[in-house]
């Protein structure tokens, strides 16, 4: 099913550790807010949405430096906030693109979402820096 995320995109400049699925996490859509729209003619129903996150910019040994609290955002699916004040670095333990540390791991968060308008709308508004998303998976209708 087609989709688009943005408004901005970033690619890691060093190889990633902590995952066997590095291609899923080497890039990200980011912004304030970052947004994604998945599908345009989805049948009404409940869909299982898995959002994949990995910090590749902020943290020890990464391009942005900084640390916990450098990126904090909410996750809103179809108008409902499903995660508040999410800090990938705090949740994952480190930056996957770090050149000085092997700490950190990707994070997957799964939610069931009711779709009535033909598309799954995702917003990632930030209170610090930018919201971001590495990848996503949609299954359904369930």
Predicted regions and their residues:
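Compositionally biased, intrinsically disordered or flexible polar/acidic segments
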Residues: 1-142
């Amino acid at each position: 099913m087609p989709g688009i995320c943005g408004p901005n995109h970033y690619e890691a400049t060093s190889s990633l550790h902590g995952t066997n699925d590095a291609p899923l996490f080497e890039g990200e859509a980011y912004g304030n807010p970052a947004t994604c729209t998945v599908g345009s003619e989805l049948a009404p129903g409940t869909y299982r949405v898995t959002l994949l996150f990995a910090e590749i910019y902020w943290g020890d040994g990464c391009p942005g430096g900084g640390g916990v609290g450098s990126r904090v955002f909410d996750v809103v699916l179809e108008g409902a906030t499903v995660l508040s004040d999410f800090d990938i670095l705090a949740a994952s333990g480190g930056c996957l693109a770090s050149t000085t540390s092997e700490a950190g791991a990707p994070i997957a968060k799964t939610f069931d979402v009711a779709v009535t308008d033909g598309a799954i709308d995702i917003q990632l508004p930030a209170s610090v820096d930018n919201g971001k998303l590495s990848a996503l998976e949609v299954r359904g209708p369930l």
